[in-house]
Amino acid sequence: MMALGVPPPPSRAYVSGPLRDDDTFGGDRVRRRRRWLKEQCPAIIVHGGGRRGGVGHRALAAGVSKMRLPALNAATHRIPSTSPLSIPQTLTITRDPPYPMLPRSHGHRTGGGGFSLKSSPFSSVGEERVPDPKPRRNPRPEQIRILEAIFNSGMVNPPRDEIPRIRMQLQEYGQVGDANVFYWFQNRKSRSKNKLRSGGTGRAGLGLGGNRASEPPAAATAHREAVAPSFTPPPILPPQPVQPQQQLVSPVAAPTSLSSSSSDRSSGSSKPARATLTQAMSVTAAMDLLSPLRRSARPRQEQRHV
């Protein structure tokens, strides 16, 4: 049977309400309740100072002795070994941040209400560090000369079996790997392509398949001149004067001959006998035309002789 004047035990695992000693109203009741909680549950944590702590006014029945939150961000408390509950020997209480899902590392509040985590030398266990990037390796001038000579010789994409041989030549002047040789040729090929696209007059690069991408203007002109066949135009001769042929046929017979020749040309399928007959008729007609002139000329000659 419970004694008079002792408050009944709490019905839940935690008790809400102000648990501070500086309360102006109901301070005796709070002190009596704390004393009763300490007697009934010797392993209990009583958190107070809600305005300063930021965790809230609550008493957690965690199976440990009464303690207050420390002023630091994190603190470690020892638990008595006589505790009836099976709990770990060490408990870490973190005030900032109060969320149990965040990693145990020191954080800093940001202006926007966020929470940024930063690594701490005290909480470096289990964290993964990003390795620092390797410094870029610059080839030596002797190695660049060897690579340029190989590239200009026509080997733009060296095969796999050639890359180790090139690396052995370059290792005489410094340490180099097969990957460095491969990437140098890739970068050199892209630089030559960009130079050709921008209209540069440098050395012509080679394409992916080993074909010549372009040629300089002078070389292309010489190549076209050598391939094109030599053509020499014929000499221009002065025009020769046309000598007129003397026509012995009388002008009266000319139309007849022209008509006969045109008729012969138009009738290509006429027989040779018809052509001969036409020529004989033209000659007879010409003689008939000339005969009156001869007759009139004879009396005149006779009159002169008389």
UniProtKB/Swiss-Prot annotation:
Matches recorded under CDD domains: homeodomain (cd00086)
Comp. bias regions, Gly residues: 199-210
Q: Which residues bind DNA?
A: 132-196
Any single GO molecular-function term of the entry would be:
DNA-binding transcription factor activity
- Pfam families reported for this sequence: Homeodomain
Q: Where is the composition biased (Pro residues)?
A: 1-11, 231-242
One GO cellular component term, please give it.
Answer: nucleus
User: Where is this protein found?
Assistant: Nucleus
Q: Which family is it part of?
A: Belongs to the WUS homeobox family.
Q: What does this protein do?
A: Transcription factor which may be involved in developmental processes.
Under which name does UniProt file this protein?
WUSCHEL-related homeobox 13
Q: Lineage, please? A: Eukaryota, Viridiplantae, Streptophyta, Embryophyta, Tracheophyta
User: Which gene holds the coding sequence for this protein?
Assistant: WOX13
